[in-house]
């Protein structure tokens, strides 16, 4: 069976869907099922005609939108993708009837459009183009309150492993044997001790060559969409004694740019030199080769193209600019590295300790409930680097570096500045906290941002989200944004998206984290906006309200009139989890009390109609 007959495709914004798809791909490889593994956007659309078995894992982002790598390739092409092709109206209703398929959606039921992206893809492929499902679509919920794990208390991984089990059982039932040369043999799993070499990997051009690149300038090639900005302001706007450092971060674009309120900036950060040195110390066999020129055996891996590939291509530069070893490892990381726990020379207890480490890494890779992995990695927020420091028996071949470590992905930040202004302003909360291990943790990108100085350069892209529709610019806007959720709303009020804007902002203290408070009060005094701040830990300045939903309820009759009678736009931004759920519940009660809706069902239906009309906008993270 050729690799074009089976495809494992993913649509992933944060990496979860991609990781589960990678685990499935790994399992299929070990069973000798040749297949294509790719994002939906980077899958060659002509291959869909040869494909017979298609497995899709997809998450949902934003307002029930498709992840970007469903409709845009790593090089920024949106015209020649599979999804663009499948949306063509002229395609016949039986266009995909040659394909057997299965779908897994990863979602969070606290969002209004739970697993909406996968449902869009499923509807088009199955209901409209005739693909045949092997089994019913599966949907996993982070909250365990909806989808395939509703009420079970089990996480999304339980749904994934059931999805995987059904696919492998299906394929093994139909293809129990395989052809090797002229012989038909039983299909059996490859020895778990054997590492599966990736299609393309690194090659040391000449390890004995005296040429090396150390400390010289770097450039990036292969991504024409990347832009460069110059830092003009990096100012803390919370009090020094406040627990959170929030920055007013501004950079001037070197190019003419266009963006609207609700659009985001993708920033390309990199690891510190100190963390790179720590990684090299974990793998001392790499040190003599760290600055030697490298090349690829079979072309540049697709995932490196976003942002461009660093030049000169050396191990040190790859670790600094491309390898996200400061991230929390996913189970696919352990699947690939456990077999390389072979170095007994650094074990105090010798071979016995090495075997213990090897066994523990294998358990992290294969444990289906993932509880041990969660306790070891996720709860203490342990990084890949720290895993490598804990398990010194790991001795990784340099050649497969990019198969072991995930790529550093750009981080997305909502724009705060006025539309199309060449001075792009962001409102960034610096991630820094202590874990249960009492260790300080920092975010790779926000730590990078916190250290930038005026005059430094930064690499970025603008991502246009089209959250605010032009036809609604005359409608009233009701905007809710606790904390740094203010960022896109600040862009909206500065850009005057509507002649009638109400802004509900929440923070802890008026004198500590009242972000852009004076500017917003000045706008309110000038009659440009109605501004309703609330301070959850400051009873002196907020005596009768605590959270933004309390202020919404206080002015509930007015807000309901704006949303129902005057077809207003509701724009909610901030942290995902409890906040958006509480806001939505408050709106439902307001609609029943002041909007003329007699029960939950009719109020919920009105909110759904607002979503369909793009009048209910939720941007949470």
From Swiss-Prot:
GO terms for molecular function: flavin adenine dinucleotide binding; FMN binding; NADP binding; NADPH-hemoprotein reductase activity. The gene is TAH18. Disulfide bonds: none annotated. It comes from Candida glabrata (strain ATCC 2001 / BCRC 20586 / JCM 3761 / NBRC 0622 / NRRL Y-65 / CBS 138). Gene3D superfamilies: 3.40.50.360, NADPH-cytochrome p450 Reductase, Chain A, domain 3, Nucleotide-binding domain of ferredoxin-NADP reductase (FNR) module, Translation factors. This is NADPH-dependent diflavin oxidoreductase 1. It comes from the Eukaryota. Its cofactor is FAD; FMN. Residues 6-168 form the Flavodoxin-like domain. One of its GO terms (cellular component) is mitochondrion. NADP(+) binds at residues 536-537, 545-549. Belongs to the NADPH-dependent diflavin oxidoreductase NDOR1 family. FMN binds at residues 12-17, 59-62, 106-115, 142.
